Design a protein with these regions (language model features):
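N-terminal periplasmic accessory domains that precede
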Residues: 69-72, 88-91, 103, 118-123, ...
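Short acidic/polar hinge/loop motifs at secondary-structure boundaries
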Residues: 108-134
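Transmembrane beta-barrel wall of Gram-negative outer-membrane proteins
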Residues: 170-200, 210-277, 317-328
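Membrane-embedded beta-barrel scaffold of Gram-negative outer-membrane proteins
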Residues: 326, 333-349, 392, 407, ...
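Gram-negative outer-membrane beta-barrel transporters
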Residues: 445-452, 570-578, 587-589, 594-682, ...
Length: 714
């Protein structure tokens, strides 16, 4: 999406708390106090851990009034790119969401459908901290951690008694947010319950493009002159505003057996709905009335047809339920957890629309037939590990289990906007996988300066029970299972110099199973029997049950430096080499696959070759005095796939900001620059051109009382 289509958002918030976090005078966002992280599954100082780590705190989230977890990550963390066109599209060191393990209180929340994370499902105001570990972590966390780990920790009670927080926020595009939290700590019990509701009418976007050459409509016919996109297609209008309505609630209950042992059950549930409203057309008749159906002649002699369905977007629905039960024994350094991520609803509906002239108002209300793709999924997992202190050695051993499944159904709807109305299924797809793992890590503190980490993980991965059925044509398939095993070693060194400087180097091997939708999902294309040959007339997307796991080797070196208590800086260089890289293959050549003739070709995920990623990351923080502090981070990244450069990655990512904190005021200003993500020959400054963009943010916080705060953010 071109930067010129990025929107400005203004929010005004009121935060009220009964002894709430929001009213407590806290240290500056960029203060350099030591931070403990869990990059090695053991407590380590941020400056000492042999990895590149960023931390986002509850105060960061509160002061910036971030509307989503993805926004908090993309705005502050080094090397993370947040897509401006999707709430959930992030990449880290060139790896996408499916290759970044995301956990909430230790529970993985990557979905079983395509491995991505719907960030809108995670209530952002309930987050205590986010730890971002960049680089391969598969030796401890498994295959989804080839790009890194994002660990989200939710809030716990810190004081006895009953406490509560209220946040009310309103902004542009009818954006509102309500957050209500209540916490109670009494004797051995901690209980935290909360509710969050977000709603927005959205903004005009997602423009409609047409290719020239279609001439099936004879009436009406109109002459028009419209602009072109970066793909040399004609922009004729748009779907309108993408309205979002999400509602979530959460419960976290902890029983403390004593100071060292506790049992915690947490649950959060989210409903997320979206729809496009108020479609618009740039094609108009002589009276200036919008046209959504007709034949369009251009001044250059080219032409195309437009249909009302082109201007109608999607109606989407998601429902998540995440359960997590954890036992922690800090004294004996034993931890165990079992969890379920149950995505009860996931999918969307669409329509071809009416094939007749229609007004904008009637098109918005049109509720004729359509289709729905519905793909709920489940992820079950278990992890337990124990740590032993053996002289100069800290030994950690653990085991883990993870299973995923999805079942996709495609329906014909009588009312394309109503998912609960009359419908009939015409396609079924699904499959499962599971992984058993054991892992071991040893930290050898050779002396007070040198620490050596060595670890290994064994994975046994199986994909099975894959199926596909086309109910209209009677074609059904079952797929053979596949089993793979892999050893994933990791080795790291950390050396402390005398002048508050730490050097580190690491190597990690990763084993990444393919996501289930790439293995077992076909993209609906009608199968017909033509003279005894099963045939698909249009191009289809096929399942690939033979898809193999990727393997990667990641190398990293870095240095971290402190100057007193006011300045910290770090530099790291990395390179990741991937074998059997999974890429999207497409051909227009007529091909027979699985006994079906695809006349116009097909698309499919395949192990196509090797990929190489490399990059540099720089981070610096400085506290001038008690009032002023600043930060800057920069990432350069590049990827080649079989020798060809991947232009979809931004080469340069820059974040910088400054904070002023005095008396009752806390003022923040920060900015982000993302370089272009397109080939050099693409025309810039047009829709669909991935131009560079620059985002600035301002946040004004005023503590009215110790329990109430006013916020204004841009």
């Amino acid at each position: 999406m071109s930067g010129k289509f990025l929107s400005k958002a203004i929010l005004f918030s009121l935060v009220i708390g009964a002894n709430a976090f929001s009213g407590v005078s806290a240290a500056n966002v960029y203060e350099l106090a030591p931070v403990v992280v869990t990059a090695t599954k053991t407590a380590e100082s941020l400056e000492k851990v042999p990895a590149s780590v960023s931390v986002v705190t509850a105060k960061d989230i509160e002061d910036h009034n971030y509307s989503s977890t993805a926004q908090a990550l993309g705005a502050t963390s080094t090397g993370i790119y947040l897509s401006p066109v999707a709430d959930g599209g992030i990449s880290m060191r060139g790896f996408g969401s499916a290759d970044i393990l995301v956990m909430v209180d230790g529970q993985p929340v990557n979905n079983g459908w395509n491995g991505s994370v719907d960030w809108g499902m995670i209530p952002v105001q309930n987050i205590e901290r986010i730890e971002v570990v960049r680089g391969a972590a598969s030796s401890l966390y498994g295959g989804r951690a080839v790009g890194g780990v994002i660990q989200i920790t939710t809030k716990e009670n810190k004081e006895d008694g009953l406490h509560g927080d209220v946040l009310l926020s309103t902004g542009s595009n009818s954006t509102t947010k309500q957050v209500y939290d209540a916490k109670i700590k009494k004797d051995k019990w901690d209980v935290n319950v909360g509710y969050e509701k977000r709603k927005t009418d959205g903004w005009r976007g997602y423009f409609i493009e047409e290719r020239p050459g279609y001439n099936d409509i004879s009436d009406p016919t109109v002459d028009a002159d419209v602009g072109t996109s970066a793909r040399d297609r004609y922009i004729v209008g748009g779907r309108g505003r993408k309205a979002i309505d999400s509602e979530s609630y959460h419960v976290k209950t902890t029983y403390h057996f004593n100071e060292d042992k506790k049992l915690t059950y947490s649950y959060f549930h989210t409903n997320y709905n979206y729809a496009y409203n108020d479609p618009f057309s740039f094609i108009k008749d002589k009276d200036g009335k919008e046209i959504f159906y007709g034949h369009v002649n251009l001044p250059n002699g080219k032409y195309f047809d437009i249909y009302p369905g082109d201007f109608l977007g999607y109606v989407g629905q998601k429902e998540w339920a995440v359960h997590n039960l954890a036992y922690d024994d800090d004294k004996n350094q034993f931890h165990a957890r079992i969890g379920l991520t149950d995505i009860k609803k996931d999918g969307y509906s669409s329509t071809g629309g009416p094939e007749e002239s229609i007004s904008a108002g009637d098109l918005q209300k049109w509720n004729g037939d359509g289709s729905q793709s519905f793909y709920p999924s489940k992820t079950k997992d278990f992890d337990m590990h124990k740590t032993w202190e053996l002289g100069q050695h800290t030994l950690l051993a653990g085991m883990a289990y993870r299973s995923e499944s999805f079942d996709q159904t495609r329906y014909k709807l009588t009312n394309w906007r109503n998912h609960d109305g009359p419908k009939s299924a015409y396609e079924l797809h699904g499959g499962k996988d599971e992984s058993w793992s054991g892992y071991l890590q040893d930290k050898w503190q050779a002396n007070n300066r040198l620490a050596v980490y060595a670890g290994v993980r064994f994975d046994r991965y199986k994909k099975y029970d894959g199926y596909g059925s086309y109910l209209d044509s009677g074609v059904s398939r079952t797929y053979a299972e596949g089993t793979y095993t892999e050893w994933s070693p990791k080795f790291s060194l950390e050396y402390a110099l005398r002048n508050d400087t730490t050097l580190f180097a690491s190597y990690g091997h990763s084993f990444t199973p393919p996501i289930l939708s790439s293995v077992y999902r076909d993209e609906g294309a009608k199968i017909q029997n033509v003279n005894g040959q099963l045939t698909v007339a249009k191009k289809g997307s096929l399942a690939n049950p033979d898809l193999k796991p990727e393997t990667s080797d990641t190398f990293e070196i870095g240095v971290k430096k402190k100057w007193g208590d006011k300045t910290f800086a770090s530099v790291s260089l990395y390179k990741a080499e991937t074998k059997d890289a999974i890429e999207y293959y497409s051909t227009k050549k007529a091909t027979i696959m699985n006994g079906v003739l695809y006349k116009n070709g097909f698309s499919q995920y395949r192990n196509l070759g090797d990929a190489s990623k490399k990059g540099v990351e720089v981070e610096a923080k400085h506290k001038f005095n008690d009032k002023w502090s600043t930060y800057v981070n920069y990432a350069w990244e590049s990827e080649d796939i079989d020798g060809e450069h991947n232009y979809n990655l931004p080469k340069h990512l820059v974040h910088f900001g400054v904070e002023y904190n005095y008396n009752k005021w806390d003022i923040l200003a920060d900015a982000q620059y993302v370089s272009a993500r397109q080939t050099p020959d693409v025309e810039r400054g047009k829709y669909q051109s991935e131009d560079s963009f620059f985002i600035t943010n301002m946040a004004f916080n005023y503590n009215v009382t110790p329990e109430a705060k006013l916020q204004f953010t841009i």
